[in-house]
Each structure stands twice: as C-alpha cells, then as structure tokens.
Amino acid sequence: MKKIKVLCVDDSALVRGLMTEIINSHPDMEVVATAPDPLVARELIKKHNPDVLTLDVEMPRMDGLDFLEKLMRLRPMPVVMVSSLTERGGEITLRALELGAIDFVTKPKLGIRDGLIEYSEVIADKIRAASRARLRAPAPAGHAAPLRLRSPFASSEKLVIVGASTGGTEAIREVLQPLPADSPAILITQHMPAGFTRSFAQRLDALCAVTVREASDGERVLPGHVYLAPGGETHMRLGRSGANYVIGLQASEPVNRHRPSVDVLFHSAAEAAGGNAIGVILTGMGKDGAAGLLAMKRAGARTMAQDEASCVVFGMPREAIALGAADEVMPLADISERILTRLGDRGHRV
C-alpha cells in the first residue's frame, strides 16, 4: 500500500515531534520531512514532493498565510493548517481556507502533547481527506459581490437547513452570497471548534445581503437571517414556540464524532418544520447529516446534495445520495438559485 507522504511545517520542535509521532502511528501515512519555517519547507517540497502539507499559521521568517498564498499560486497542493485555539487563530485560519487550504486542526492553549495525542484520529482523518481532496482556486481578494438573486417571496414558515464539513466554509459563502436580504431563515451546522464560528459568522455577515450571526439558545428564527451553530460545545436544534421557530442549543455528547452535528439539526428540522423546509448537504468527510437528510425528506422537505465534481471532499453528500436522501444532486454554483426556485414552488412540499 502506497503511504500518504506528509511534510510538517511548524516552528515548535515539540509540535513537529508530536505530529510525526501521530502520523507515523498510522500505517497508511508517513512524515517524509519536517521544517521549522516556510523557507526550509520550500526546499523540502522540491526534494520530497509530499502528498499533504501540515502548516503552522504563525511562524518566524515568513508566516503561514504568506507562504500558503505563494504555494497555492505557484505549486498548489493539499494543505492542512495547524492553528492556535484563539479568536485571532480562528480569523487567520478562515483566511487560510479562503486561500485554498483544505482543512485545519487546532493546537490547545495548554497541554499541547495531551491535546494533540487526544485528536490523533481526527488529525489522521483530515490528512487522509486532504490527500484525496480536490484543489480549488483561492477565493478572490475582497470577494467581488455576485449578482444577487431575487426571492420569490419571504415567509416566516419557510426555512433552509444546511450542513457541511471539510471545504464547507467556502461552499457556504458561495451559497449565501447570491441570496437576497429577504430570503427565508437559514440554519447552518458547519463542523468547527469553539471560538471559530463567531469569526466565521462575522466574515459572512460582511459579505452577504442576509444577516449572519452565531446562533444563541432560545432565540426566535427570523426571515433574512442566517444562524450558524456555535462550534465545539453544543448541538443546534430547531424547535417551535407557538407559531414561531426557535433555536435550541444543547450540551450533549458528540454525534457521529461531531459537536455540533449536522444529523442533530436535520432530525430536529424534520420534526419541527416538515415540508416547510429545504435540506442541503454540502462538501465534507464522513456520514454526518446523511440520515438526518433522509428524515427531512420523509417528513416532506425538499432535499439537495452537492455533486462530486464541485465538492472538496465527497463524503457526506455521497452517503446521503447512497441512502436515497437527496431529491436533487447539483453543482455548488447552482444551489442558491435552486433553493429560491424551490421556495417559489407551490404544493405541499417546499
């Protein structure tokens, strides 16, 4: 079996050693070299031609973002960012994903050894996914505003429910940016750690006509608003309070190894919204969301899955399609317009 060749770039000798230990403990991958900074890494990339690069965000001589930008322009390859679990780390990591990084892992603030070892399987899964991922062009600087679509109508009864993982931050941006300000409410679960989703919501809010915010427990769901599940600590559910939809955040065990889980959101939407919802599953590894999307379909919702050609990682959509959970499969570029078309359809299903 051909092993996945990994180059680890980090200014911390401790982190380089731990990443090497973790990666080499898996039989399908190996660290072929490590580098303390991007300038050394540049020569090692030429020498070893790695399949995946793990790249620290903040380093001396040249920071990770500058190096990533040059790398994706001159020699594109799958990159997994290694970021500190801080608000600043979150903002930098989101920019790295815009520049073309496939995914990221977080370094704990304290107890780095125990923290990284604890996430050994997650790190290995992300490297495997990156090795198979489709590279995409970096997002243009400033994100030129797309042509806004027209909403067929705004109704407090209609909802769009979205789930995503690896590659999802850019996919979500592409879905939301064309939507008009009077779009129905949208609830999104994107796999992210605590502290990152607020920065993500703020970035989206600055780019979109709809209002994007990190969801709060108990808040009423309003048209023209997008609610992003807070990362890491709770699951987001859709519920009812009289005639209104409300958001519930629940601190319970991970589902499908994730918290927040897409399945939890989708199952709650099936129960609370039934045929008034549209369910959308986007790029991501694993199977989270597949069973929940099927539950939404059985409850009367219209359901959509991103197609293989436009996914960074065709995992979650593949599982949903295999279950028969998706009414339609389409390229990412078509999803926004299709959502609004479905919202304008008459009948018992959205």
Curated annotation (Swiss-Prot):
Gene3D superfamilies: 3.40.50.2300, Methylesterase CheB, C-terminal domain. It is an enzyme of class 3 (hydrolase). The keyword rRNA-binding does not apply. Its EC number is 3.1.1.61, 3.5.1.44. Residues 152-346 form the CheB-type methylesterase domain. GO terms for molecular function: phosphorelay response regulator activity; protein-glutamate methylesterase activity; protein-glutamine glutaminase activity. It catalyses: [protein]-L-glutamate 5-O-methyl ester + H2O = L-glutamyl-[protein] + methanol + H(+); L-glutaminyl-[protein] + H2O = L-glutamyl-[protein] + NH4(+). Residues 5-122 form the Response regulatory domain. It is found in: Cytoplasm. The keyword Cytoplasm applies. Its main location: cytoplasm. SUPFAM superfamilies: CheY-like, Methylesterase CheB, C-terminal domain. GO terms for biological process: chemotaxis. The modification 4-aspartylphosphate is found at residue 56. NCBIfam families: PRK00742.1, PRK12555.1. PANTHER family: PROTEIN-GLUTAMATE METHYLESTERASE/PROTEIN-GLUTAMINE GLUTAMINASE, PROTEIN-GLUTAMATE METHYLESTERASE_PROTEIN-GLUTAMINE GLUTAMINASE. This is Protein-glutamate methylesterase/protein-glutamine glutaminase. It comes from Bordetella parapertussis (strain 12822 / ATCC BAA-587 / NCTC 13253).
